[in-house]
Amino acid sequence: RQRQMCIRDSPYRAPKDYRKQALASVTTHDLPPTAGYLNFAHVKLREELHLLSEPVEAFAASAMAERTAMMNRLVENGYISQTVADDVEGHVQEIVEAMHAMLTDTPSLLLQAALVDGVGECRSQNQPGTSREYSNWRVPLADSSGHVVHTDEVFDLPRVQSLAAVMRREKR
């Protein structure tokens, strides 16, 4: 449940509170892609795989509270408008980019953007706690529409280019 941008039990850290000698990222291979996090794909997957140690309603409520805390942080710091925060599903790419923009405002010397966030993938590449229950590391990379993305076309995708511009601080 922990996002890389947060302190273990929330609230989310302000960008200025990150350590300089650190690698900062929005997600990792053990967490859902950010688009999946925003649309609760991780809740559905963990329920399907029977990985929850609490009722799905409680886990879903916790996930909603985490997402709301992140939207509040993004709004408070001017990365998105309240209108965008109120319509997450309609603004996934904008929010993913805003989360990465917030990352670029940290003092951390190393920043990481996940390829899955660049293409808009929602499915987890790895699900900790599974071996045969989930196709870890065998999930084909796909875009937000579910179309497979081949490695030779990744950097031609407008969405990847847009996220790269955010990471280079060219886009705000």
Predicted segments, located by residue:
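Hydrophobic faces of well-ordered beta-strands that scaffold small-molecule active sites
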Residues: R1, A24-T27, L111-A113
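A structural signal for the main folded, soluble domain(s) of proteins
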Residues: R1, Q125-T130, S144, V166-K171
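Short, small-residue-biased leader/transition segments that mark boundaries at the very start
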Residues: Q2-I7
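Short, solvent-exposed loop/turn segments at secondary-structure junctions
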Residues: R8, D30-P32, V116-G120, G146-H147
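Short conserved micro-motifs at the rims of enzyme active sites and ligand-binding pockets
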Residues: S10-A14, T34-L45, L49, C122-N126, ...
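Non-catalytic regulatory appendages
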Residues: K16-R19
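Conserved, mostly hydrophobic/aromatic
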Residues: H29, W137
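A glycine-rich beta-turn/hairpin centered on an aromatic-Pro dipeptide
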Residues: V56-A113, V119
